[in-house]
Amino acid sequence: MGSMIEFARNGQRLGGYAAKPEGAGPFPAVIVIQEWWGLNEHIKNVAERYAREGYVALAPDLYRGKVTADPNEAGKLMGALNREEAVKDLLGAIQHLRAMKEVRGDRIGVTGFCMGGSYALLLPCRTKEIRAAAPYYGEIPDEAALRNLACPILYVYGDADFWITKDEVKRLEASLKKLGQAGEVKIYPGAPHAFFNDTRKDVYRQTEAQDAWRRTLDFFAKHLKA
């Protein structure tokens, strides 16, 4: 169902994993942003799951082919990733999707996990071309950035997360309310960071992950399929 592709962004070539539903479309689309491990089989599988639900899914390869299962190496890769260049990669992914005949160009969403969750929340603060965003346990921008949030969000979080604090999530909720931004924060008691990743038995929580998936599908259906 899916395969590696290349697409252009600002004159550069960037790789990514694309998965499409069966049929001619046009379909809504979802950008799937990797964890700090890189574009691994788990992220490719998530893209394929979205395709089975009727979305064209594109997971950009932000690390340019580098993938690891070692936390120390993952930290180095994430630390070496230039945030503004990564945003340009994601903006390029949007333009690639908008140019595809199989895609409804005004129905593009974004999701991401861990590091990817950070970018999935930042991206709709940088462009109005994202219709809905579902960041999972990502870093939260400051209020000045959130002021530019251009779409509804569903922020998914487990309150046993060692990376993102409960206070940060409360700050997000308060900022959304203060700014009048459309958003929901779903908190899973006792769920750790990366609880959605079913390839990591140390942190995967099946019940919470399945519920988060259902909620995310409902959220995207409301904003991307309507």
Language-model regions, residue ranges each:
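Serine-hydrolase catalytic machinery in alpha/beta-hydrolase-like enzymes
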Residues: M4-V103, N197-R200
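Hydrophobic residues in well-ordered beta-strands that form the structural core
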Residues: L58-A59, P135, V185
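Short beta-to-alpha linker loops that shape the active-site pocket of alpha/beta-hydrolase fold enzymes
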Residues: L62-G65, E139, A191
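Primarily recognizes the serine-hydrolase "nucleophile elbow" in alpha/beta-hydrolase
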Residues: L91-A150
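Short beta-strand/loop motif that positions the catalytic acidic residue
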Residues: L149, Y155-Y157
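Acidic catalytic loop of the alpha/beta-hydrolase fold
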Residues: A160-I164
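Short alpha-helix in the alpha/beta-hydrolase fold that links the catalytic acid
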Residues: T165-S175
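C-terminal catalytic histidine-bearing segment of alpha/beta-hydrolase fold enzymes
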Residues: K177-A226
